[in-house]
């Protein structure tokens, strides 16, 4: 049996607004948008970052706690590896991301900063750990 990590799907109140935000704030490109506007995938490399409308959770029989910018962040984050975490953090904040902590050097040598997206999801903007390991 083979298992591989394929998707992270965030259930969001507005898929199209979330796509626009991730394009502007993080420079990600849209890979796929279903005609219903309830599901989209972004170009992110080997693992797919996807957005699904909250209605999709309901359609799939899932009870979820909706993401909301004003609520305490969920205990999960999206980590985006950046060539320049500071520039990426600045771009995200200029695009409307809520700044949490600017990029700083961690004891293990990685540069890490945090923002929240328009829906309140935690987004880590970080340097690549493979350069350190």
Can you annotate each of these PLM segments?
Residues 1-7, 29-81, 87-116, 127-133:
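Vicinal oxygen chelate
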Residues 12-14, 107:
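Conserved beta-strand-loop-alpha-helix junction that forms the acyl-donor binding cleft
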Residues 15, 85-86:
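Residues at or immediately preceding the N-termini of alpha-helices
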Residues 18-23, 92, 120:
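Conserved active-site tyrosine of GNAT-family acetyltransferases
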Residues 122-125:
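Short glycine-/small-residue motifs
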């Amino acid at each position: 049996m083979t298992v591989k990590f394929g998707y992270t799907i965030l259930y969001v109140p507005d898929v199209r607004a979330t796509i626009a935000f991730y394009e502007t704030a993080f420079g990600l490109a849209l890979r796929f948008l279903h005609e219903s506007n309830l599901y989209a995938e972004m170009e992110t490399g080997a693992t797919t970052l996807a957005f699904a409308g909250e209605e999709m959770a309901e359609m799939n029989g899932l009870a979820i706690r909706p993401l909301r910018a004003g609520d305490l962040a969920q205990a999960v984050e999206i980590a985006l590896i950046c060539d320049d975490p500071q520039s990426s953090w600045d771009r995200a904040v200029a695009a409307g991301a809520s700044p949490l902590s600017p990029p700083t050097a961690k004891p293990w040598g990685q540069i890490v900063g945090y923002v929240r997206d328009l829906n309140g999801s935690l987004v880590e903007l970080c340097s690549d750990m493979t350069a350190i390991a």
